Amino acid sequence: MLSGARCRLASALRGTRAPPSAVARRCLHASGSRPLADRGKKTEEPPRDFDPALLEFLVCPLSKKPLRYEASTNELINEELGIAYPIIDGIPNMIPQAARMTRQSKKQEEVEQR
């Protein structure tokens, strides 16, 4: 019965343009819904580190060869192809289009040497 009242209150508050009262906010918060003021805020979490134990299971999606973790750049490196996959919030982005080239092509090296 109480949960039904919470649902009706939440529905009624969502339909109004006026900000909900403090009592209504507490009811919504108790029902598991986040208050409107908190919806746009991001929680400050410390950045997650990459777990090197995952290297045992991860391979380059292009060459199927093992990868090397480079802590200074926070990337997984494929030495053979000369590409680096970024690690974002502790999660490797293994999409080939997201990888960056670590080696310059011969044509670029020649242009820079001139």
Curated annotation (Swiss-Prot):
Residues 14-49 are annotated as: Disordered. It is found in: Mitochondrion. Keywords: Mitochondrion, Transit peptide. Gene3D superfamilies: 2.20.25.10. Changing residue 91 to S: Reduces interaction with NDUFAF5. Residues 1-35 form a transit peptide. One of its GO terms (cellular component) is endoplasmic reticulum membrane. It is linked to An homozygous frameshift variant in the second exon of PYURF have been found in a patient with profound metabolic acidosis and clinical features including muscle hypotonia, failure to thrive, developmental delay, optic atrophy, persistently elevated lactate levels in the blood and cerebrospinal fluid, and abnormal cerebellar white matter and cerebellar atrophy on magnetic resonance imaging. Interacts (via TRM112 domain) with NDUFAF5; the interaction is direct and stabilizes NDUFAF5 protein. Interacts with COQ5; the interaction is direct, stabilizes COQ5 protein and associates PYURF with COQ enzyme complex. PANTHER family: PROTEIN PREY, MITOCHONDRIAL, ZGC:162634. PREY and PIGY, 2 apparently unrelated proteins, are respectively the product of an upstream and a downstream ORF contained in a single bicistronic transcript. Belongs to the PREY family. This is Protein preY, mitochondrial. It comes from Homo sapiens. The lineage of its organism: Eukaryota, Metazoa, Chordata, Craniata, Vertebrata.
